[in-house]
A protein has these predicted regions:
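Short coil/turn linker and secondary-structure boundary residues
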Residues: 47-48, 96, 150, 173, ...
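Radical SAM/AdoMet-radical enzyme domain recognition
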Residues: 102-116, 123-240
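Radical SAM enzyme core and accessory elements
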Residues: 1-61, 283-373
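Radical SAM enzyme [4Fe-4S]-AdoMet core and its adjacent flexible, acidic
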Residues: 188, 199-329
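A short, flexible beta-alpha/helix-coil linker loop
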Residues: 89-92, 173-176, 243-244
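Short acidic, gly/pro-rich beta-turn/loop elements at beta-sheet edges
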Residues: 44-46, 82, 152, 178, ...
């Protein structure tokens, strides 16, 4: 056994108290060891590739600055019942009033604010929330399943009120697989939503939630689909969050495996992706990786329509200027709080919690409420 990190912090999966921990390598696997005074000693896997983990783990004990993005959960309501959901509660008491949202916006110093949930389009006053955000000099985005965005008039209303961007979930391009993840085949509605966004908003992201053993084969298909939506689609975000909220099977995928999926889909190697981090062209930690697609060195022949390729000739190496991010979330018994900061893309606030990092919010408030679909 080899100690990779002598001291870090974790959360007890039972009482959620912050506790001391360390990270060790044992027989090629990476384990988090921690001891809660009330609930004893635990060992849980962090990564199955010790060499990979040693290359990407954070060595500085200095906490990085909070990201300049805020995600507000104004509601826990939703208009569908997915088999995977990190906030499966549907408590209307968690709805935030327009005044409460305004107070949050007044305290947030940065311009970019995302509204998620739940499903933000389930709130009848979402257009007013967007208008309020604009009036306070900020750029409003929504994180959505896209079902209501299949309505052209609704998209037009959101655009008129100042919606800046959309992150739309698309977990498969196959109806049967989408039914397994989302509860029903919503593919037609999601594709119509994308068409409407191209007409009215012209800026969106594609988000893919990976479930091990269910939609792994769809990763590359959705990734290449996102590339074909450029220049309207400006980012592709893939994540695996098996220990949060409602899950189909609770099976985890480690970041080394997620990067292998990305590398295979992009036509590069995992070592190429890690080299980008060494060159300062990508960010990487045990839970997340992010880079610009045009820096991956991936071939693009056949990925984009000829008309789009003609427009993108001016872009370096004829590659889409798209942000690519993959996240492999920790389970509740193996969270390294220091490393979660390296994968924290946003701060989070809802009616039940103050502003805090995304991962701390998910694990403290939803990590222990695992449900099988």
């Amino acid at each position: 056994m080899k100690v990779l990190k002598e001291k870090t912090q974790s959360l007890c999966p039972v009482c959620r108290e912050t506790i001391s921990a360390r990270v060790v390598a044992d027989d090629g696997n990476v384990l988090l060891e921690h001891q809660c005074p009330r609930h004893g000693v635990r060992r849980a896997p962090v990564e199955r590739d010790a060499e990979f983990f040693a290359a990407v783990m954070t060595r500085s004990r200095n906490k990085p600055s909070p990201p300049p993005y805020l995600t507000v959960f104004p509601t826990y309501r939703c208009n569908i019942n997915c088999n995977i959901c990190y906030v499966p509660r549907r408590d209307p008491a968690m709805d935030m009033s327009l005044e409460e949202v305004g107070a949050v916006l007044d305290r947030w110093p940065h311009p970019d604010v995302f509204f998620a949930g739940g499903e933000p389009t389930a709130m009848e006053n979402l257009p007013q929330i967007i208008a309020l955000t604009r009036a306070k000099g900020k750029r409003p985005y929504i994180v959505t399943n896209g079902i209501r965005l299949a309505e052209p008039r609704y998209v037009a209303e959101l655009a008129r009120n100042g919606l800046h961007g959309v992150s739309l979930s698309l977990n498969a391009l196959d109806g049967k697989t989408l039914e397994a993840t989302d509860g029903r085949d919503y593919l037609d509605a999601k594709l119509q939503a994308i068409t409407n966004l191209k007409r009215r908003l012209r800026r969106f992201a594609i988000c893919f939630s990976l479930v091990r053993g269910v939609n792994e084969a769809e990763f590359g298909k959705v990734f290449r689909f996102a590339l074909r939506q450029y220049p309207f689609a400006r980012s592709f975000h893939a994540e695996c969050l098996p220990g949060i909220g409602r899950s189909i099977n609770g099976k985890r995928m480690f970041l080394s495996e997620m990067l292998d999926l990305l590398a295979n889909s992009a036509g590069v190697t995992r070592s190429r992706l890690l080299a980008l981090a060494a060159q300062g062209k990508a960010t990487v930690g045990p839970y997340g990786f992010a880079a610009d697609y045009r820096d991956l060195g991936a071939p693009v022949t056949g990925l984009l329509p000829a008309a789009v390729m003609a427009v993108t000739k001016a872009i370096r190496s004829r590659r889409p200027d798209m942000r690519v991010r993959v996240i492999a979330g920790p389970l509740t018994d193996s969270v390294d709080l220091e490393e979660t900061w390296s994968a924290t893309t946003t701060m989070v606030v809802s009616k039940e919690n103050p502003v805090m990092p995304l991962w701390e919010y998910l694990i403290r408030y939803h990590g222990g409420r695992h449900e099988s679909a």
